C-alpha cells in the first residue's frame, strides 16, 4: 500500500504510506527474486516516493497530476486504474452510503478526463477489476469496466490493448516468476501464445461482442456464456467452440480439429 483507499474505514485515501526506506527494501527484495513491485496509490506524493524506489505498477492513481503521469511514463511504469471508481454509476452502488453520493459524483466529474490524460502523457495502461462487495457484483463490474473504458479512453482499440498486449508487457516484468515465459502475450505473431477469441462482430466498433456492457448491477454475471464469443483458445487449446453449431467446453488440442475446415474460414490470412 502506497496510500489509503476509497472504501477503507481506517485508511484515508489522501494519505501517503510506508517510508521510503521500507518501500526501497520491498523493491530490492522483489528484484532479488527477479520481479517487480505494484502499489496501491492515489496521489502525487505517494507516486513520487514509489518511483524513486523503482516501483513499476500503480493501481488507481486518480488524483495524480499530468507531470506525475509523465514521470511514470519516463520510468517505464504502468497505471492500472479501476475506471468504474469515477463513473457516475458509482452513485447507484449499494456500497456507497447516501451521504457520500454527492461526493462520489463530484469526484467523477472532476476526474472525468483521467483516462485521456494518461494516454496524452504516454502512460501505458492495463486492465484490472479491483472491487469491493459481493463476488457477483465484482463479476458484473468487470464487464461494465470494459465498456466504461471505451467511454473514458475514447478508443476501443486502446481498451483492447489494455486487456491484452499491454497487460502482457507488465506481466513480462516478473522475469523468472512469469508463468508465460515461452512467448509474448496478447499479440498474434509467430512464437506468441496462441490465445484467441473468435467473435461474431467487430470489437473495434462494438465492445459488447467480448462482453462489455453499460449495465452494471443489473447485468448478467460474467460466468454466463457470452453469445457472441464462438471460440476460446488458450495456449493452442480450444476450450469453447461453437463455430459449426456445437459447443465443446472441454480443452482440446489444436490438432483435434480440422483447422482449415472449422477455423480457417474465420481467421483472415493477414
Describe each region flagged by the PLM.
Residues 3-113, 124-134, 200:
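Active-site core of metal-dependent hydrolases
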Residues 49-50, 69, 90-92, 137-138, ...:
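Short Asp/Glu-rich motifs
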Residues 20, 50-63, 134-151, 193, ...:
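Short, electropositive alpha-helical surface patch
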Residues 32, 109-203:
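His/Asp/Glu-enriched, well-ordered alpha-helical/loop segment
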Residues 242-270:
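Intein/HINT protein-splicing elements and their conserved insertion hotspots or analogous self-processing inserts
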Residues 177-182, 190-252:
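C-terminal cap of metal-dependent C-N hydrolases
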Residues 41, 50, 71-73, 118-120, ...:
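Extracellular/periplasmic catalytic domains that process cell-envelope and extracellular macromolecules
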Residues 52-54, 72-73, 94-95, 140-143, ...:
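Short, glycine/charged-enriched secondary-structure capping and boundary segments
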Amino acid at each position: 500500500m502506497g496510500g489509503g483507499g476509497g472504501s477503507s474505514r481506517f485508511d484515508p485515501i489522501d494519505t501517503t504510506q510506508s517510508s521510503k526506506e521500507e518501500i526501497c527494501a520491498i523493491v530490492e527484495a522483489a528484484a532479488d527474486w527477479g520481479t517487480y513491485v505494484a502499489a496501491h496509490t492515489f496521489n502525487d506524493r505517494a507516486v513520487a516516493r514509489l518511483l524513486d524506489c523503482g516501483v513499476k505498477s500503480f493501481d488507481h492513481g486518480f488524483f495524480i497530476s499530468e507531470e506525475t503521469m509523465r514521470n511514470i511514463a519516463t520510468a517505464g511504469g504502468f497505471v492500472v486504474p479501476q475506471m468504474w471508481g469515477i463513473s457516475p454509476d458509482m452513485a447507484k452502488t449499494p456500497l456507497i452510503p447516501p451521504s457520500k453520493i454527492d461526493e462520489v459524483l463530484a469526484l467523477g466529474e472532476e476526474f472525468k478526463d483521467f483516462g485521456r490524460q494518461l494516454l496524452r502523457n504516454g502512460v501505458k495502461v492495463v486492465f484490472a477489476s479491483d472491487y469491493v462487495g459481493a463476488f457477483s457484483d465484482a463479476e458484473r463490474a468487470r464487464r461494465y469496466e470494459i465498456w466504461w473504458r471505451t467511454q473514458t479512453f475514447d478508443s476501443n482499440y486502446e481498451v483492447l490493448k489494455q486487456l491484452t498486449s499491454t497487460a502482457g508487457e507488465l506481466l513480462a516484468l516478473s522475469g523468472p516468476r512469469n508463468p508465460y515465459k515461452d512467448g509474448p502475450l496478447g499479440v498474434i505473431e509467430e512464437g506468441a501464445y496462441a490465445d484467441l477469441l473468435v467473435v461474431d462482430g467487430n470489437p473495434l466498433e462494438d465492445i459488447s461482442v467480448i462482453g462489455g456492457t453499460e449495465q452494471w448491477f443489473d447485468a448478467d454475471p460474467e460466468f454466463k456464456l457470452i453469445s457472441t464469443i464462438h471460440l476460446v483458445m488458450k495456449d493452442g487449446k480450444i476450450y469453447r467452440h461453437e463455430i459449426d453449431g456445437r459447443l465443446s467446453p472441454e480443452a482440446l488440442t489444436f490438432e483435434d480439429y480440422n483447422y482449415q475446415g472449422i477455423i480457417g474460414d474465420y481467421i483472415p490470412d493477414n
